[in-house]
Regions:
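C-terminal terminal-structure detector
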Residues: 7-14, 142-202
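A short, structured surface patch at a secondary-structure boundary
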Residues: 87-148, 188-195
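Short, charged cytosolic
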Residues: 1-5
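Short, glycine-rich, amphipathic interfacial segments at transmembrane boundaries or analogous
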Residues: 55-93, 151-170
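Positions in alpha-helical segments
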Residues: 27, 42, 55, 95-99, ...
Length: 202
């Protein structure tokens, strides 16, 4: 069930109002600028494995409203319905192109569409599948869902896949408390560094 609307502090509201206009503008510019890269990746996916270019999955967004997240498909068609829920470094379900775009985080680029549509933000807690929040308290879920989910966030630059689920939630809650333009820029810079170094990727 979707969480009830959270009561967000005055500090969070005043540090958050600028995010949507900035996200809309930056995602729109990025979609135009990166259109050639989108085309190249799309062609490589289509030429090397049968199936759609995009992978869609239902996630929980603002106020835990469900939405479809977009990624470039990196696994063989039907692999998400069988086998382990999470992938490993040498997962046979991942295609050759899939390994490359995962390692470089290029598989996340289509989430610019989610940002442009208002479903996500550049920076924020990652959008979860419902079962990933089963151990979170109702208060933690409400607070976490009081902001739009992000392509990257504090947890992702603080350990990413090496963190426990509770540690990720704790980082998410810390982000909600400290949300500001300066904080988002700091996380964005750290994210770019990690992507360049291919840190924390499968």
């Amino acid at each position: 069930m979707p969480a009830e609307p959270a009561v967000v502090s005055h500090e969070v509201r005043t540090g958050y109002f600028w995010k949507r206009p900035a996200d809309f503008m930056l995602s729109g510019l990025a979609l135009v600028a990166l259109a050639p890269l989108f085309l190249v990746i799309s062609l490589l996916i289509k030429l090397t494995s049968p199936g759609p270019v995009f992978f869609r999955q239902q996630r929980l967004g603002l106020k835990e409203r469900p939405f479809s997240i977009f990624k470039f498909r990196s696994m063989r068609t039907g692999s998400d319905k069988t086998g382990a829920q999470f992938t490993s470094a040498n997962d046979a379900r991942v295609t050759g192109i899939g390994k490359l775009i995962r390692k470089t985080s290029l598989d996340e680029l289509p989430q610019l569409i989610n940002i442009f549509r208002g479903e996500m933000s550049l920076i924020g807690p990652r959008p979860y599948i419902g079962f990933e929040l089963e151990n979170a308290t109702p208060d933690e879920r409400r607070k976490r869902a009081s902001v739009r989910p992000g392509v990257s966030g504090l947890a992702q630059v603080s350990g990413r896949s090496s963190l426990s689920q509770q540690a990720v939630i704790d980082y998410d809650l810390q982000y909600v408390e400290q949300c500001s333009l300066k904080f988002d820029i700091q996380i964005l810079i750290q994210t770019i560094r990690k992507v360049i170094r291919c840190e924390g990727t499968n």
